[in-house]
């Protein structure tokens, strides 16, 4: 038989397992505080599985109320290009959901600084080479996480469903 302390461990473990594969596209859930207000233990009917399932069901019932979202990594991107390619790069950054923060002129080249979601720059080296006749270069540095725009969440969830059913 389980002790009351063991049931608390199983409830916690059930919640942790549920949070590791969240409701939106299976990504982990972060920034959640959970408080157990009521739970009972019975020598005959209580077991590990029942407590884990109870924690999972409690979280699933709470999800519509907490309005989960998806976060994405944002990078600071510095692009150095010849003056003739500045317009092309600025337009491209806009297409990639980037926010241009500034530009610095240096001896015939411009350094463009922008914040761009990682998903939009995964193949940027190849694209930059094509846009600048192989003369541009860039660097990137992780900054923070931000919420994915609402219009993209449904697409991400749908793609994850396809991937998870294979």
Predicted features along the sequence, with ranges:
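Glycine- and Gly-Pro-enriched alpha-helical subdomains that act as flexible
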Residues: 38-74, 78, 83
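Conserved P-loop NTPase/AAA+ ATPase motor core
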Residues: 11-25, 29
